[in-house]
Amino acid sequence: MNTDVLNQQKIEELSAEIGSDNVPVLLDIFLGEMDSYIGTLTELQGSEQLLYLKEISHALKSSAASFGADRLCERAIAIDKKAKANQLQEQGMETSEMLALLHITRDAYRSWTN
């Protein structure tokens, strides 16, 4: 497992809380969400892309934390904080950083589950 991206302890805690049989089901949903985020964030441009980045960053704060995706969670928190302070710009690096982390995190989970 890529410990730089995925927090094994949080995944084990989640498994203990909800049952190990439920983790693959919820993880599949989370992976699907990441695929959707990647696709939509890539397709949108300008202010629509920025608005979507704000939306997914807010959503990812909790879902990434629940699944032990610590780097993704940290980035989502930072972007959400900037969004609330109106400090995000259309040509900012946040979108490319979020896309890169979504890809890295999704791929790390897929290789972990295979």
From Swiss-Prot:
SUPFAM superfamilies assigned: Histidine-containing phosphotransfer domain, HPT domain
Location of the HPt domain: 19-114
Q: Which InterPro entries match?
A: HPT_dom_sf, QS_phosphorelay_intermediate, Sig_transdc_His_kin_Hpt_dom
| PROSITE patterns attached to this UniProt entry | HPT (PS50894)
Q: Which Pfam families match?
A: Hpt
**GO molecular function annotation:** protein kinase activity
State the UniProt keywords alphabetically: Phosphoprotein, Two-component regulatory system
Gene Ontology biological process terms in this record: phosphorelay signal transduction system
Which residue positions does Phosphohistidine occur at?
H58
Top-rank taxon of the source lineage equals: Bacteria
Functional note: Phosphorelay protein which receives sensory signals from LuxN and LuxP and transmits them to LuxO, at low cell density. LuxN and LuxP transfer a phosphoryl group to LuxU on His-58 and this phosphoryl group is further transferred to LuxO. At high cell density, as LuxU could function to establish an equilibrium between the aspartyl-phosphate of LuxN and the aspartyl-phosphate of LuxO, LuxU transfers phosphate from LuxO to LuxN (and probably LuxP) and finally phosphate is drained from the system.
- Subunit composition? Monomer.
What is the name attached to this protein's record? Answer: Phosphorelay protein LuxU
Taxonomic lineage: Bacteria, Pseudomonadati, Pseudomonadota, Gammaproteobacteria, Vibrionales
Gene that encodes the chain: luxU
